[in-house]
Amino acid sequence: MNDNNIQVLPEMSSVWQETLNWQPTVEQKQQFQKLYELIILGNKKLNLTRITKPEEFWEKHLWDSLRGIKFILENKIHWSEEKKVIDIGTGAGFPGLLVAIILPQYAVTLLDSTRKKISFIENILTDLNIKNALTITNRVEQIGRLFKYRETYDIGLLRAVASTVVCAEYALPLLKIGGIAILYRGNITTDEQANLPEVVKLLGGKIERIEEFKTPLSNSIRNCIYLRKVGKTPINYPRSVGVPNQKPLLSLKKI
């Protein structure tokens, strides 16, 4: 792991505290650094991320991943709860790996359809000694129809996966009633805001809140959309592999 080209992540203790009302432990900071090193090295073989500079990596991967669960971080009561989490389309492991690192009581499932990326993440789990995470190589449309996974999870995480309505169709079938899906977004379009409530209702959910915020270093606008599962998702959702993305529910409404 000694690579002279790999730099050290910035400390940022005060920024963690000011923005998330939370700070990582010394051990967690060490895990963040090792995760950074593993991803930079893995990037030489796999197309994991274009974000490689330490400050950018801290802001756009570490901080951004944890901003979505700020409501958990700032209330220690949640830390000891045993929750089941699924990171849908985990890619290089964000935000799911971060959740597994800082919330060891949570059982985190990292889902991706690309076997090479899942193999890489499995090596990370071993190298970082993360015991509370497992991986699945599959399409979300397929596992969303399986009894083993459907209505199983307390929290669904979706970051840089698809449009909001597609993410809703991916996530809500997997959530227990009372569960929450967290959609990590940049800007939200007017069309998304107009169409999402009806689509979410169809899938057994409701929009609990939308949080707009700026990132602490680059002042980029970001949004997190929180969808609460309030009723059963109709059995015909999610639709077959590829269909949610090719024919989003919002477009079907207009036909």
Curated annotation (Swiss-Prot):
Keywords: Cytoplasm, Methyltransferase, rRNA processing, S-adenosyl-L-methionine, Transferase. Disulfide bonds: none annotated. It is found in: Cytoplasm. One of its GO terms (cellular component) is cytosol. It comes from the Bacteria. It is an enzyme of class 2 (transferase). Its EC number is 2.1.1.-. S-adenosyl-L-methionine binds at G89, F94, D112, S113, T114, V140, E141, R159. GO terms for molecular function: rRNA (guanine-N7-)-methyltransferase activity. Specifically methylates the N7 position of a guanine in 16S rRNA. HAMAP family: 16SrRNA_methyltr_G. NCBIfam families: rsmG_gidB. Belongs to the methyltransferase superfamily. RNA methyltransferase RsmG family. This is Ribosomal RNA small subunit methyltransferase G.
